[in-house]
Amino acid sequence: YHSADYGKTFTRIADDSKVWGFALSIKQDPTEPNLVFLGTEFGLYVSFDKAKTWNKWEHGYPKAVSTYDMTIQEREADLVIGTFGRAIYVLDDIRPLRAFAKNGGKAPVGKITAFPAPDAYQAEIQQPHGERFMASAKYAGENRVFGGRLSYLIQDEKEKLDSLTVKIYTASGEQIRTLKTLPSKGVNRIIWNLDRKSSAEMTGGWGGGQGGGIHLRHLRQV
């Protein structure tokens, strides 16, 4: 239920006609109030219109699992979900969902829309000693990929794109990387490894990384 008058009256926002299973948890986005997440006995739901309508979320999430608790990690804009029997799930970077909610559940205008990218950090990971061949003795979830995550929306229904070019610039305007990918309709995500474009002067070894002040400046369809 939802109250807009400090508890004097309540409006039911979820029932059997809208969601499947008992409601167990609910979380409203502190940045975009129209974006609301609902956890039920049988899955996760998302609303882009302040709980008026619900959409079942099944992208990388179990179709039927008790969704007991949720919180939003505001620095990373991640939705962290606690389930019963299926461990913890993290929905990385909900900024694209905020854009939909801000627009009343509709996609932003334009064939291609680039969403604000989260901060990315360069890190060198070393495997700890004694954990090389663990077989089935170790249970661990899969971490998200390293690098910069760039999200964009394709909503052209008539024309299918052969490829998409992403150009990355420094704060001073220097182009340092060009990425190409095969996009599909809807929200897409490409990972940049925080490296510069190759140089003919480099003769070997590992390529150097890139420091701060990086901006996604240009998307071009081909």
What positions do the PLM features span?
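Short, glycine-anchored, charge-dense loop/turn motifs used at functional sites
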Residues: 170-174, 222
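Generic structural detector for well-ordered beta-strands
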Residues: 27, 116, 151-153, 180, ...
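Contiguous beta-strand segments within globular domains
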Residues: 124-163, 169, 189-191
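Glycine-centered tight-turn motifs at strand-turn-strand junctions
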Residues: 175-218
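Short coil-to-beta strand junction motifs in C2/discoidin
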Residues: 159-164, 217-221
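Beta-propeller blade termini and top-face loops
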Residues: 1-138, 145-148
